[in-house]
């Protein structure tokens, strides 16, 4: 059995060649070079150089083609034989009214063809039955042993195959009883292929492609049973008798005789039985016309259904019908109920007269044995491919091809392995069960559709790149017409041979086993797409392949002897290899060539969508194969594509245009052809044919000069007849022309026998011209006549070979090598002579040795050409030999004078030739020079050398020839270098070590290294470092012993220098500690004064504001500080960095700065007061309008005016104060109507630059500063600020202690006590508790507090009607009280007000918090009416802030509840209550408050706890860290002490940084 498809074994790979660019330039030359290797495989693959990538020149939009349809399992020869066999056996049963059903055995379709062949091979049916060898038959069919399969096969053979075989043999059929068996598997109904009718069948649509297009449909096994009683078998009755022996079909109870009506009555009605796809059976009785229409519908219906007809039995009671029929066997008409009518010839037979007899009247169509035999013996038609009806473009074909492949393999096309496609292809072509149909755009003419290569046809302009590829020899339009190609001598454009064909393939599309026309070469180039798989067989095995295929499929070759020339037959390579045929394979990828050699069978298939181009070409070595091909065609009677004789004669007519190799090959072929022509014409004369006439055969159409016997195209001669002018024969078939007399026949010839030798002679002259030239070259190279030729004569011979285009033979190569060698000798000799003339200035490395000079002279003497430079070389050799004698004498008398040795050495260098003695002289000179250099370097008077110099001397000494003096000097030098490197390493360790050494250690190392007579860089660096350390120590002593403590900048500079020194310094550790302490103090001071992320430095905050008088400068510099662009530490007081080191200068400058700051703020107040108020309805924008920190002009409600600079700002852009110290009054808190105690004081961020700590905190910093042994600019500025604050505090206390002010304070205290004593209701209203997350909830109270106050008329405001319930009731109460507020509470005389206002101004300029400041502020507030606009603005801002706090509180509550729901731990209620307070403000002030708490922790609680109220200034919110206690009980300001936290609402505007 043949190999299965699943175990397909790929054949070995064919040779693959990768030519270099030099080899690639000559296509036919390279192919001739690889031919000895590649020809043994039949095909080969060539990969061009990577840069050779021709553009695709096809016009894609206009390219349209109609492909061929290929059914894969009809391509393979053995599969087609099986299908033909099944079609014939199916026809056999069909004409007997049965349909072929192929049974299943062991779950696979029974191979009826193989079963039939094996039965024949085993001796036939009778012999197998006799010997009981059906088990052996099952074994040969690869069925497993046991299971009684042999008996099953016998039953199927008897039922299906044996009747057909008996009919084929012409013997009478014998009765074969069916053996009953129980078969569980179902038979498959066979649908005939009708292979001969393929060309007339409409192609299937590609949208019906399926991976497994099953041809075989299951059908139940017929059995003998009463059909009428069994409804299932009644359904099966529609299939007729089935593929059984006659008499074994289904038997119905109603057996009626069919008769023919001689008188021509109307045809009986027929029953059309249709099995629909749903499984229902429909029986219709129709008229003949309707029946014909139904048959037409069946032929065009696409539905998968089965239809057949059954004739109804004629009524046997009709006497006319009975008398009309007689049996053809017994010639009787009795028993007409058992008389059968043949549907083919209308003859009648008794069912019992047939052999074998039939038990009943069969249903359906029945034909007699004579008709069955005639139908089965009909010869099959030739097989070929049919054309598709759809026309494709490249895009539409590609879409179809890719879709088919992706659907078939169920994966993307580029991911399908080539091995899988190959195995699946051979499985499909070997499969009878599966029909897979593909399309192949093959043999598309490039002349009509355009080539894939650029072509110079003047139809369009080509780019330079396209022009290069259009003229390339590898362009398939150019290769067939190259000069070395034979086809260039054929004028006609032979499509497919001279003109390329195009191939557009899809997966599984195949090209079958074939050889090229006239056994020519072929070359195929894959332009793009997926690979193409090739199989090849060498020419030596071509006949073997043909024999194997004929042996395996004789049925095909019997009807079509030239089947392999039709390109329609495949055979599995494994099958061929198993029969000894050598097969190779390859995968041709895009951009690769595949070449097939003469008479090399090849086939293959495409892996997917691709585009290829192919053409034939013929070289000189093809001519013998072409002649043999004509003889082969003559035997097969196959038409020729062109006349081989005509081609030879046309090349012989112009021998000078032929390549020499081609001329020699043509001469050889021409000679054979002339000899054969002589023989044939002589045979013609012997037959008595003497008439002849000249005929220009090349002018006749090919079909008019073809031999009517062998179809060969005639050219040299042909035999014709006067009486039969329609035909002629070649001289090989002179007896097959006609039956006419020889006297009526005549010879038609192209050349006479005298002209042919003349043409042959011209070829010989052209071919032998090479021999004449070769003899001349041979004589010259071998000096056969004893005379050497000159170079000019040899060059002339080489030029002749080039001009006459002689082949690149071995002799020509010898001539070229001789010329090349002679010219090299001449050039070398001239260089030797010119080198002597150049003397010591010649190029180094060009000298030759004495031995080389002698060999060179011998080489020149041995060359077969004469050169006059030989005499010059001999003269140089004599000079060198004389010099050698002198040198030997000088070396023998050592020690000689150094001057003598040097002069001899220079003379030898002028010769241009190296003499062995010269090297010895050179060594002696080098030794003397090196020793002198060592002495000079180590001399005591010499300057110290470096380590590099010493190493260089050692390296140079290593190359000096050894001697006692040299060895001693080298040892001393090495010892000194070792010592020096050791000390250098010590110094390096000292410089690089992490643990620095003290100066004493370094001094010891330096002192010991002074005795080494070598310059040591690390020792020198160590000296410099030690000197710097001493200078640094001196600077430290100087600065520590000065009149004042050293400045921090100086100490930092010294520390930086000291750290860089590689010396261990005790003073450095002390300085680092002092600097660290100073930095710690400055950091602590910064945390005390500076806000978080402040744009000011500590020094700027501590010093008076230098820009207080200029609003624009102050604002612009503040913006620059916000952006980090402005730094002015050294410009604060107008002092330079050096002046800042003098304490006196700092104090003087600070005093001057105080005065300038005061003058500046007064000027700024006047300027800002002149600006229009944003609250005024008539305010208009002008150049003097106030601008907020956000960069916009504040306008309308929400604007606040700074109490210091009098400028206006948005309330939402700055930190604003709270009106009340606490939203829940207590018995000890201030009365609600004491509006002068409300915290309404506002300082803008430009005026309040720091946290403004309390004076007690500053004093603690000063105490720490006194302990520092370092001077800081910030420390001195802090001292000045403290003195300024204490001075102001003293003046403020003095003013508050005056008689007038004391009286005013007393009256204000009485008013406060009166308001405090206001009686409360007995049952104050209570309010629902606020949520735990409410940011307004404070303290531990559960209910809302009592709210009390006093209206102007003394009425109580604590009634429920006057108090708003719920959250925010304090703000609503304040809002309701605003219309009732009147003032002033005190009458403040101008004499008293003016000093207080001036003090208030100076106090606001201080960056320190003082209680006296707040006392003066409350007194001034009580002395004027309440600022209703500011109070309303503050109320609105606080309401907005509380609304945001409630939203945040609700979010926190929801988050806490989600945690509880998830099973997590809830948040601490106290923490939840306090959390909203900490997030009250999202601006920088909230972060500052948190930082103050951290500062308090870091300072260790230096200030008092935050239990006592502090002043109500805006800075108190910044000072919640509680660094110092409030002076609540000292001085007259105690009654006015309250806690007034600031309020900050985030501004929706962009910050100044973003605005800028």
Swiss-Prot record:
Residues where Phosphoserine is found: 287, 301, 317, 893, 897, 1359
UniProt crosslink position (Glycyl lysine isopeptide (Lys-Gly) (interchain with G-Cter in SUMO2)): 205, 229, 244, 274, 295, 1127
SUPFAM superfamilies for the chain: ARID-like (SSF46774), Clavaminate synthase-like (SSF51197), FYVE/PHD zinc finger (SSF57903)
Reactions this protein catalyses: N(6),N(6),N(6)-trimethyl-L-lysyl(4)-[histone H3] + 3 2-oxoglutarate + 3 O2 = L-lysyl(4)-[histone H3] + 3 formaldehyde + 3 succinate + 3 CO2
Keywords: Biological rhythms, Chromatin regulator, Dioxygenase, Iron, Isopeptide bond, Metal-binding, Nucleus, Oxidoreductase, Phosphoprotein, Repeat, Repressor, Transcription, Transcription regulation, Ubl conjugation, Zinc, Zinc-finger
Domain JmjN: 14-55
Subcellular location: Nucleus
Compositional bias of kind Low complexity: 1541-1556
Residues of the JmjC domain: 468-634
Cofactor note: Binds 1 Fe(2+) ion per subunit.
Domain of life assignment: Eukaryota
Zinc finger (PHD-type): 324-374, 1185-1250
Job description of the protein: Histone demethylase that specifically demethylates 'Lys-4' of histone H3, thereby playing a central role in histone code. Does not demethylate histone H3 'Lys-9', H3 'Lys-27', H3 'Lys-36', H3 'Lys-79' or H4 'Lys-20'. Demethylates trimethylated and dimethylated but not monomethylated H3 'Lys-4'. Participates in transcriptional repression of neuronal genes by recruiting histone deacetylases and REST at neuron-restrictive silencer elements. Represses the CLOCK-BMAL1 heterodimer-mediated transcriptional activation of the core clock component PER2.
UniProt subunit comment: Part of two distinct complexes, one containing E2F6, and the other containing REST. Interacts with ZMYND8.
Protein name per Swiss-Prot or TrEMBL: Lysine-specific demethylase 5C
High-level lineage: Eukaryota, Metazoa, Chordata, Craniata, Vertebrata
Gene designation: KDM5C
């Amino acid at each position: 059995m043949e190999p299965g498809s699943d175990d397909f074994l790929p054949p070995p790979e064919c040779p693959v060649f990768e030519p270099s660019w030099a080899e690639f330039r000559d296509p036919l030359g390279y192919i001739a070079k690889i031919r000895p290797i590649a020809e043994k495989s039949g095909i080969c693959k060539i990969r061009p150089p990577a840069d050779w990538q021709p553009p695709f020149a096809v016009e894609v939009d206009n390219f349209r083609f109609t492909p061929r349809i290929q059914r894969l399992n009809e391509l393979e020869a053995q599969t087609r034989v099986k299908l033909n066999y099944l079609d014939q056996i199916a026809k056999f049963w069909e004409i007997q009214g049965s349909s072929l059903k192929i049974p299943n055995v062991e779950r696979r379709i029974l191979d009826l063809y193989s079963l039939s062949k094996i039965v024949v091979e085993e001796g036939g049916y009778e012999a197998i039955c006799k010997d009981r060898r059906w088990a052996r038959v099952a074994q040969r069919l690869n069925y497993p042993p046991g299971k009684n399969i042999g008996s099953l096969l016998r039953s199927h053979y008897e039922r299906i195959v044996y009747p057909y075989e008996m009919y084929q043999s012409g013997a009478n059929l014998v009765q074969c009883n069916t053996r009953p068996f129980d078969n569980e598997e179902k038979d498959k109904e066979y649908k005939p292929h009708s292979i001969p009718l393929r060309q007339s069948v409409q192609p299937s649509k590609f949208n019906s492609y399926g991976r497994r297009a099953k041809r075989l449909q299951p059908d139940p096994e017929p059995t003998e049973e009463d059909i009428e009683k069994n409804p299932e078998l009644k359904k099966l009755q529609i299939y007729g008798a089935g593929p059984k022996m006659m008499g074994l079909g289904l038997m119905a109870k109603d057996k009626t005789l069919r008769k023919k009506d001689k008188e021509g009555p109307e045809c009986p009605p027929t029953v059309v039985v249709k099995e629909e796809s749903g499984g229902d059976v429909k029986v219709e009785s129709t008229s003949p016309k309707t029946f014909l229409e139904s048959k037409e519908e069946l032929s065009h219906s696409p539905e998968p259904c089965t239809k057949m007809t059954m004739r109804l039995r004629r009524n046997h009671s009709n006497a006319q019908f009975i008398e009309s029929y007689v049996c053809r066997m017994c010639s009787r008409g009795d028993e007409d109920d058992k008389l059968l009518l043949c549907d083919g010839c209308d003859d009648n037979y008794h069912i019992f007269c047939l052999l074998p007899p039939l038990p009943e009247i069969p249903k359906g169509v029945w034909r007699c044995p004579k008709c069955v035999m005639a139908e089965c013996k009909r010869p099959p038609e030739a097989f070929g491919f049919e054309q598709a009806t759809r026309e494709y473009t490249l895009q539409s074909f590609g879409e179809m091809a890719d879709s088919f492949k992706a659907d078939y393999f169920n994966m993307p096309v580029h991911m399908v392995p080539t091995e899988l496609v190959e195995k699946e292809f051979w499985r499909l072509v070997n499969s009878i069960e599966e029909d897979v149909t593909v399309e192949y755009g093959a043999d598309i003419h490039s002349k009509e559709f355009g080539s894939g290569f650029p072509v110079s046809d003047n139809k369009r302009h080509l780019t330079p790149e396209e022009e290069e590829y259009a003229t390339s020899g590898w362009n398939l339009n150019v290769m067939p017409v190259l000069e070395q190609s034979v086809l260039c001598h054929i004028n006609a454009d032979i499509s497919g041979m001279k003109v390329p064909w195009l191939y557009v393939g899809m997966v599984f599309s195949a090209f079958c086993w074939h050889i090229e026309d006239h056994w020519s070469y072929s070359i195929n180039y894959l332009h793009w797409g997926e690979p193409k798989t090739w199989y090849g067989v060498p020419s030596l095995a071509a006949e073997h392949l043909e024999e194997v295929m004929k042996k395996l499929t004789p049925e095909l070759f019997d009807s079509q002897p030239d089947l392999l020339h039709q390109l329609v037959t495949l055979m599995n390579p494994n099958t061929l290899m198993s029969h000894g045929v050598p097969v190779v394979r390859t995968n041709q990828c895009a951009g690769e060539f595949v070449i097939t050699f003469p008479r090399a069978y090849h086939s293959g298939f495409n892996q997917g969508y691709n585009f290829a181009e192919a053409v034939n070409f013929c070289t000189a070595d093809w001519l013998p194969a072409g002649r043999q091909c004509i003889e082969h065609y003559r035997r097969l009677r196959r038409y020729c594509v062109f006349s081989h004789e005509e081609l030879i004669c046309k090349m012989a007519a112009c021998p000078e245009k032929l390549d020499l190799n081609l001329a020699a090959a043509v001469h050889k072929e021409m000679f054979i052809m002339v000899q054969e022509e002589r023989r044939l014409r002589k045979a013609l004369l012997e037959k008595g044919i003497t008439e002849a006439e000249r005929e220009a055969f090349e002018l006749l159409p090919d079909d008019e000069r073809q031999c009517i016997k062998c179809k060969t195209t005639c050219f040299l001669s042909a035999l014709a007849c006067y009486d039969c002018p329609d035909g002629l024969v070649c001289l090989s078939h002179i007896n097959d022309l006609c039956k006419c007399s020889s006297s009526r026949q005549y010879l038609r010839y192209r050349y006479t026998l005298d002209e042919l030798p003349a043409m042959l002679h011209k070829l010989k002259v052209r071919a032998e011209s090479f021999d004449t030239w070769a003899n001349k070259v041979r004589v010259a190279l071998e000096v056969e006549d004893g005379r050497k030729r000159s170079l000019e004569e040899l060059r002339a011979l080489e030029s002749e070979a080039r001009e006459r285009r002689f082949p690149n033979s071995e002799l020509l190569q010898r001539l070229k090598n001789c010329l090349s060698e002679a010219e090299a000798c001449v050039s070398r000799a001239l260089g030797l002579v010119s080198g002597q003339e150049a003397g010591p200035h010649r190029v180094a490395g060009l000298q030759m040795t004495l031995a080389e000079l002698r060999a060179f002279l011998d080489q020149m003497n041995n060359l077969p050409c004469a050169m006059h430079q030989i005499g010059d070389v001999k003269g140089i050799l004599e000079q060198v030999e004389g010099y050698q004698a002198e040198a030997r004498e000088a070396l023998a008398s050592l020690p000689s004078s150094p001057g003598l040795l040097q002069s001899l050495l220079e003379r030898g260098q002028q010769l241009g030739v190296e003499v062995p003695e010269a090297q010895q002289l050179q060594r002696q000179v080098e030794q003397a020079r090196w020793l002198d250099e060592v002495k000079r370097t180590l001399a005591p008077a010499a300057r110290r050398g470096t380590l590099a110099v010493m190493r260089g001397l050692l390296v140079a000494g290593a190359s000096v020839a050894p001697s006692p003096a040299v060895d001693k000097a080298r040892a001393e030098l090495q010892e000194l270098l070792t010592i020096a490197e050791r000390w250098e390493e010590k110094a390096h360790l000292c410089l690089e070590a992490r643990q620095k050494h003290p100066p004493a250690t370094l001094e010891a190392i330096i002192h010991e290294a002074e005795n080494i007579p070598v310059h040591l860089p690390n020792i020198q660096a160590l000296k410099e470092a030690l000197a710097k350390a001493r200078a640094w120590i001196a600077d430290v002593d100087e600065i520590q012993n000065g009149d004042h403590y050293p400045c921090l900048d100086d100490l930092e500079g010294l520390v930086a220098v000291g750290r860089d020194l590689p010396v261990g310094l005790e003073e450095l550790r002390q300085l680092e500690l002092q600097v660290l302490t100073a930095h710690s103090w400055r950091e602590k001071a910064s945390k005390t004064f500076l806000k978080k992320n402040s744009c000011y430095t500590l020094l700027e905050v501590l010093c008076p504001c230098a820009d207080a008088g200029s609003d624009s400068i102050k604002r612009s510099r503040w913006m620059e500080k916000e952006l980090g662009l402005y730094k002015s530490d050294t410009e604060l007081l107008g002092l330079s960095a050096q002046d800042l080191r003098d304490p006196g200068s700092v104090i003087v400058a600070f005093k001057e700065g105080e005065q300038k700051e005061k003058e500046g703020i007064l000027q700024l107040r006047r300027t800002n007061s002149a600006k229009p108020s944003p609250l005024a309805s008539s305010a208009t924008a002008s150049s003097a309008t106030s601008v907020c920190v956000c960069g916009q002009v504040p306008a309308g409600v929400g604007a606040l005016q700074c109490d210091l600079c009098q400028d206006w700002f948005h309330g939402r852009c700055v930190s604003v104060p709270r009106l009340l110290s606490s939203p829940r009054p207590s018995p000890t808190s201030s009365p609600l109507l004491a509006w002068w105690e409300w915290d309404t004081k506002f300082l803008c961020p430009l005026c309040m630059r720091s946290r403004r700590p309390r004076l007690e905190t500053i004093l603690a910093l000063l105490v720490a500063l006194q302990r520092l042994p370092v001077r800081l600019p910030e420390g001195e500025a802090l001292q000045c600020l403290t003195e300024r604050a204490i001075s102001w505090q003293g003046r403020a206390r003095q003013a508050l202690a005056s008689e007038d002010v004391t009286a005013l304070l007393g009256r204000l205290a009485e008013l406060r006590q009166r308001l405090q004593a206001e009686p409360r209701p007995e049952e104050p209203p209570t309010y629902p508790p606020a949520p735990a997350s409410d940011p307004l909830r404070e303290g531990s109270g559960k209910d809302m507090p009592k709210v009390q106050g006093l209206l102007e008329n003394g009425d109580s405001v604590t009634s429920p009607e006057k108090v708003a319930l719920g959250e925010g009731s304090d703000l609503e109460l304040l809002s309701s009280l605003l219309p009732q507020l009147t003032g002033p509470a005190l009458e403040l005389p101008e004499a008293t007000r003016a000093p207080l206002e001036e003090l208030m101004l100076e106090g606001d300029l201080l960056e320190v918090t003082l209680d006296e400041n707040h006392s003066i502020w409350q007194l001034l507030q009580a002395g004027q009416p309440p600022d209703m606009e500011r109070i309303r603005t503050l109320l609105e801002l606080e309401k907005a802030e509380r609304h945001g706090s409630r939203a945040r509180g609700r979010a926190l509550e929801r988050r806490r509840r989600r945690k509880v729901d998830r099973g997590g731990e809830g948040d601490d209620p106290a923490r939840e209550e306090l959390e909203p307070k900490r997030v009250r403000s999202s601006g920088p002030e909230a972060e500052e408050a948190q930082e103050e708490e951290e500062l308090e922790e870091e300072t260790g609680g230096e200030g008092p706890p935050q239990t006592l109220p502090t002043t109500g200034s805006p800075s108190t919110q910044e000072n919640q860290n509680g660094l110092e206690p409030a002076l609540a009980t000292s001085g007259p300001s105690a009654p006015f002490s309250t806690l007034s936290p600031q309020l900050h609402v985030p501004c929706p505007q962009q910050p100044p940084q973003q605005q800028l």
